[in-house]
Amino acid sequence: MRLRLLALAAAVLLGPAPEVCGALNVTVSPGPVVDYLEGENATLLCHVSQKRRKDSLLAVRWFFAPDGSQEALMVKMTKLRIIQYYGNFSRTANQQRLRLLEERRGVLYRLSVLTLRPTDQGQYVCKVQEISKHRNKWTAWSNGSSATEMRVISLKAGEDSSFEKKKVTWAFFEDLYVYAVLVCCVGILSVLLFTLVIAWQSVFHKRKSRVRHYLVKCPQNSSGETVTSVTSLAPLQPQKGKRQKKKVDVPPAVPAKAPIATTFHKPKLLKPQRKVALPKITEENLTYAELELIKPHRAAKGVPTSTVYAQILFEENQL
């Protein structure tokens, strides 16, 4: 009997002994503090590294500790990847808001909390345990944990903060807005003044270009007669909308001031004559006269014409 006991003791001592329990490298991101708005979806990632055995399995558990309270188990993924809910999260309504998935086997695990509420604010802890079979028994070889704090900002607080930011921003740009309005007003006034100056100049030039009637007295010609001419510089009168029928202009009677020669009853037209050699006359015996003919403008109906008919007689001075 004693020999058997000694043999068993030697076998136990000589057989493979389990490794000493160590620590896994566990990291939770984002962290250590993360902020979410009320109603958003939160995602927490649990990274695991430095496993002691290649064939080992991992059991992942998430704990939740509200502000000023002890942590409580929320959800667990067993070594066989079975999801289990605990506490208040075991209810169907809460189960739909909480999801635990394995992104990469034995490396990355994701916890999603949907439609955040103010009661979801607190500390979230991820605890991982490495398990494997030894002598037909499941043995824990190592474990590790990491935590992060989640803060849920209510909509009212978010609106207040955004309103304050907008208020500060508006106060900053308010002065710039006033200055911009003043600059625009000055620009508009300058444009209006420039337009008025141009309009006034155009009207002034139009008035200056109006033509008036002047009676010009010409000096006496060689025959001792005085010729009175009319200069017309008046602009064209505006035409009426309807075209008037053309009427034959009848020359008016010769004014009384113009001298009428007794010997000439009717004006005679000059006929082309043959060239005749005439004696040269000195320049002293010649009298020059210039007559500028201006075609009169069409006068409106009922307005007297400004055309003057004059007969000029030339007499050669005797030496």
From Swiss-Prot:
The keyword Oxidoreductase does not apply. It comes from the Eukaryota. Residues 24-154 form the Ig-like domain. InterPro entries: Ig-like_dom, Ig-like_dom_sf, Ig-like_fold, Ig_V-set, IgSF_V-set/TM_domain. Gene3D superfamilies: Immunoglobulins (2.60.40.10). It is a single-pass type I membrane protein. Peptide Lv is widely expressed in various tissues and the central nervous system, including the retinal photoreceptor layer, hippocampus, olfactory bulb, and cerebellum. Proteolytically cleaved to generate a bioactive peptide. This is V-set and transmembrane domain-containing protein 4. It comes from Mus musculus (Mouse). The lineage of its organism: Eukaryota, Metazoa, Chordata, Craniata, Vertebrata.
